[in-house]
Each structure stands twice: as C-alpha cells, then as structure tokens.
C-alpha cells in the first residue's frame, strides 16, 4: 500500500510537470502567444512589435465604432483563450455599453495579469460636454507621442509573457518608435507654417483634443463623443454659428461615422468637406491608411492641405 501511494505521488508529479511545460509559451516550445487587441489601431501597433511571434485577433472590425460594440462568438472564444489582451482604456471600450468590461468578466480574465490598458502613462484629457463632463477622452492615439507610449506598453507585456523573444521585441520597438517620432516632428513643423486664422480642424466627433494639443491646431465638432446623440439639429446649429465667425477653409469627416450631419454643416456654411479622415479605425488592408503609421500620415497630410487652402 505504501509503495502504491509513492507511485501515485510520482505519477501526479509527472502530470503536473507535463501540464506546466505544455502551458509555457516561448520560442523553444514552438507555441505562439495568443494575443487579442480590441481594435484595428491597437492590433496594428502590436503587429509592428510582435511580428510573426504571436497569433493575433482584433475584435472590432476595421471601419466600425469601438465605443459601442457587440462582441461576436468568435471574439468571446478568442478572448477566453488569450494569453494577453490589449485594450485602449480611458473610457473607450469601457464607456458606452461597457462591452469590454462584460467580455473580460465572462472570460474570467484579470486586469494587469491577462489584460492591459495600452494607454497607461498617457497625459489624459477630459471631456467637456454637459452629459460627459469629467469623463476621459479616449482618443489619445491621435497624438503620435501617445502612439509611442502605446507601443512601449505593448512591448513591455509581450516581453513579460514571452521573455525568450525579448531582443526581437526590443529591436522592433526601437525601429517603430523612431519611425513614429520622425513623423511627429515633421507634423509639428508642418502645422507651424499654417496661418493662425485658418487653424481649426472641424470634425463630426470631438475626437481631436489630443491632436490639437500636440500640433497646435484647435478643434471644433458637431458632437463630442460617439456615445452621445449624434448630429442633432441643435448640435449642427451651434457649430454652424461658430464657423460663421471664422475663416476656416475646410471641413473633415471621419471614416467611421455617418457623413450626413457634416454635409449639412457644409451646405449651411459654404465651407467644403476637404477629406475623409481616420480616427477610430485604420483603413481596410491595401488602402491608404491601412496601418497606424499610414493612417496618421494620411490624416496629418490631409488636414495640413485642407487648412492651407
């Protein structure tokens, strides 16, 4: 009986060791980290750091609104299986219908162990509207300096989960942030050359506060955030009255919103819509703006061109 007990203990010990070994994700085991990102922007930044070292799933499809989303069965499955989950935080996926909060709770995932806010360390800007005052503005990625913070946070967690690929992640992070930094410096110089009376970026959603602070271009909008009413007659009237007091040459409309309210503003002010720009999503693969870097470059170029008219 004693011998049988000893054998049972040895058997269970072997099973435990095998289980631990099979669960380890590193280059030597041949297993890739299963990573989930909540939207296409975060997914693209992650891809630039991790390359082919991970299996990556992006939840909110390209072109859709990440503020309020209903996860599909595939999203639930991937989140449950994920080793690492990246979300924006600061009132994006956890505001509105709080879809991300419900998703990670159902998947039994733990904050700062399984899922991480890539915006950690960003200098947060707050909303101003009557119904939203005091809430965080989530659109931090529209300042390239914050995009670099996102990249560093992502690399940090990849290294923590997959230390065997540390050098790979660090090299990619260095190359990527240098590229973003160069674009950021070019943008600041570009906007310095635009006359002050033309410096006003007008969009449907008031998502350009971080952009405005970074590049010295004030912003105006129809509605403040996509979780409130969008394009009401009162909102449109307020913006039209403001624009009639300015010399702004161009308007802009985002790729992920209904363009009809901005078309009404354009008709009422005789200010043309210069371009569609990207805010909550990158473009579809193969199109201009299909990465975080190219999306930001496209936005910076189009906004500078439009305001220089």
UniProtKB/Swiss-Prot annotation:
Keywords: Cell membrane, Lipoprotein, Manganese, Membrane, Metal-binding, Palmitate, Signal, Transport, Zinc
Lipid-modified residues, N-palmitoyl cysteine kind: 20
Annotated compartments: Cell membrane
GO MF terms, alphabetically ordered: metal ion binding
GO cellular component: plasma membrane
Lipid addition sites, S-diacylglycerol cysteine: 20
Binding-site positions, Mn(2+): 67, 139, 205, 280
UniProt xrefs under NCBIfam families: ABC_lipo_SloC (NF040928)
Protein known as: Manganese ABC transporter substrate-binding lipoprotein PsaA
């Amino acid at each position: 009986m004693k011998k049988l007990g000893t054998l049972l203990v040895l058997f269970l010990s072997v099973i435990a060791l095998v289980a631990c070994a099979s669960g380890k994700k590193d280059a030597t085991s041949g297993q890739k980290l299963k990573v989930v990102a909540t939207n296409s922007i975060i997914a693209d930044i992650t891809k630039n750091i991790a390359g082919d070292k991970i299996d990556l799933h992006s939840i909110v499809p390209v072109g859709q609104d990440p503020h309020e989303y209903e996860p599909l069965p595939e999203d639930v499955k991937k989140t449950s299986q994920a080793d690492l989950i990246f979300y924006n935080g600061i009132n994006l996926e956890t505001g509105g219908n709080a879809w991300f909060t419900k998703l990670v709770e159902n998947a039994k995932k733990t904050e700062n162990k399984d899922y991480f806010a890539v915006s950690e360390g960003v200098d947060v800007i707050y909303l101003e509207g009557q119904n939203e005052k005091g809430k965080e503005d989530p659109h931090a990625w529209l300042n390239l300096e914050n995009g670099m913070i996102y990249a560093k946070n992502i690399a940090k967690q990849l290294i923590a989960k997959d230390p065997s690929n540390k050098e790979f992640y660090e090299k990619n992070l260095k190359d990527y942030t240098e590229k973003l930094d160069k674009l950021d410096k070019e943008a600041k110089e570009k906007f310095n050359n635009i006359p002050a009376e033309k410096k006003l970026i007008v969009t449907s959603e008031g998502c350009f506060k971080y952009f405005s602070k970074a590049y010295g271009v004030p912003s105006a909008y129809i509605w403040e955030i996509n979780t409130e009413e969008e394009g009401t007659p009162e909102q449109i009237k307020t913006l039209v009255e403001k624009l009639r007091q300015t010399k702004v040459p161009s308007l802009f409309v985002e790729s992920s919103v209904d363009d009809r309210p901005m078309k009404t503003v354009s008709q009422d002010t005789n200010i043309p819509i210069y371009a569609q720009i990207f805010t909550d999503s990158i473009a579809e693969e193969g199109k201009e703006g299909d990465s975080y870097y190219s999306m930001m470059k496209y936005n910076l170029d189009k906004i500078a061109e439009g305001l220089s008219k």
